[in-house]
Amino acid sequence: MKHFSRLLALLLAVALLPLTFMAAASAEEPVTITIWGSDRENMPFRNGLWTIDVLQEKLGIKIEIISAPTENLAEKYGLLIASGDLPTIVQYKAKDLLLYKDAWTPLNDLINETDTPNLWKVYSDPEIRRKVSDADGIMRFIGQRTAITAGKLYFWRQDWLDKLNLATPKTTEDLYNVFKAIKECDPNGNGVADEIPFAVRKNGSNNRGNVIPFINAWGIAETFFAEDGQVKFGATDPRMKEALEWMNRCYAEGLIDQEYLTRDKTSWYSAWTNNQVFMSYDWSAYIDNVGNLFKDVETDINIVGAVPPEGPTGISETRDQLQPITVDEDWNAGIFVGATEEQKKAALKLLDYVYSEEGMILMNFGVEGQHFNIVDGEYKYSDLIMNNPDGLSPQDALRSFGIQSMLTLLQDARYERAFVSDEVNRIRDIYEQEGHIGPAFPTLAFTNDEQSVINEKYTEIETYMNEMVDKFIMGVEPLDKFDEYVAQVEKMGLADVLAVYQAAYDRYMK
């Protein structure tokens, strides 16, 4: 009997060996984290990107991307939150992350010198930390640390100004007169008045993001801004009416693109290559992107950067520029409070790595010898990027590898200067050094009661405002009705919303 018992014990031990090996193997499997983020036309974010594969190998974790195409992105974010089944990391705009602040893991104690030294270098600064914290001072997400300020610029065809002997326009009225000359004097020489003096690609949640900066010349922003410590709402400011009158005049005369609400990047590029566009406004890299459209077609085309036009009081500025921590774009990263501890650790490991010197180089430049080279101490992108064999622009080539993607959370000024032309660097320096970047309004953190007021009243105001601003620009509604529009916004509860914003702004400025 004893012999049988020993034999049975031996057989059981042998039988359990595979299970033991399986358990050990299972313990060694990498932790899987999921990341939800916007998959843009000009910035792909999806599984299979080269940088995602490199990050997985370097960090010993598995990363699964949940791509969210940008169309109706706010609705998709709302549905994601409503489901309660969130991925490990969600990347989105700060104000929307803070709207559901309790969904994100508090980071105050997790960002420290020992466990996350690279994040600590940045977020130990109280000025930086408050930009990513809620009204109670709890740090809720990681933002993108930018390297420059002048991200968006005006640019135009200098060769058309020269051809028509037009002086460089300085004021909004000068610009209107130049637009008229472009429309009437046939600079493309085809005998048809098909020129579009100002054309942009649709941008922003309301699609007019690249048109509305003209109003900055009147010293206002479209929504909230601060003036002498007082929070104001630009869309109902008397100066907004003046700005809209100028924009409506341009639109009515065909000087502003009639398709600004619907024109995508492909259509916008086509308008340029069809020799129709004089001027635009977009991210600085597009100065080169547009210029490159003509490199094998025309030799006399000269795309140059331009400073913002001066308004009636001499203001020449844009306000939708980059800040030290960019919180208004889609790449702020919140870690889901319901993730496992292992997933949270892996998520912090990833975020800390992309904030490191090594991670910053990977996500901004790629790998030396393949994507870039160091020449005389300077980072220079390789021909794979600058003269891409598939015909991609330098920026699009980088992003096809996942370089300069949603996970590029620590930007490097060397990147910003390395892949753009001397012309882009010239005009960016002018914007930054000569006062063409207006004051930015901070992303504010609200208490629960304050957020309730915003949810109840501002959502309706914003919808109505978005509808009416476009109607005023396009002449669907006459500007004689601007005062009626203001009265309606006030009736919807603007005073209560402004009181909430003022309280949050005062807290922020302490």
Where would I find each of the regions flagged by the language model?
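Loop/turn elements at helix/coil->beta-strand transitions in domains of secreted/extracellular proteins
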Residues: 29-33, 59-63, 84-88, 102-105, ...
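Bacterial N-terminal signal peptides that target proteins for export
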Residues: 1-11
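Conserved small-residue motifs centered on glycine
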Residues: 38, 349-467, 476
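Bacterial N-terminal signal peptides
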Residues: 9-20
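Conserved N-terminal structural module of periplasmic/extracytoplasmic solute-binding proteins
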Residues: 22-175, 207-213, 222-226, 231-235, ...
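Helix-loop-helix "hinge/cap" segment bordering the ligand-binding cleft or interdomain interface
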Residues: 134-207, 225-271, 276, 333-346, ...
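Glycine-rich, aromatic-lined ligand/substrate-binding cores of catalytic
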Residues: 249-251, 268-292, 299-302, 307-400
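Extracytoplasmic/periplasmic substrate-binding proteins
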Residues: 39-45, 50, 55, 150, ...
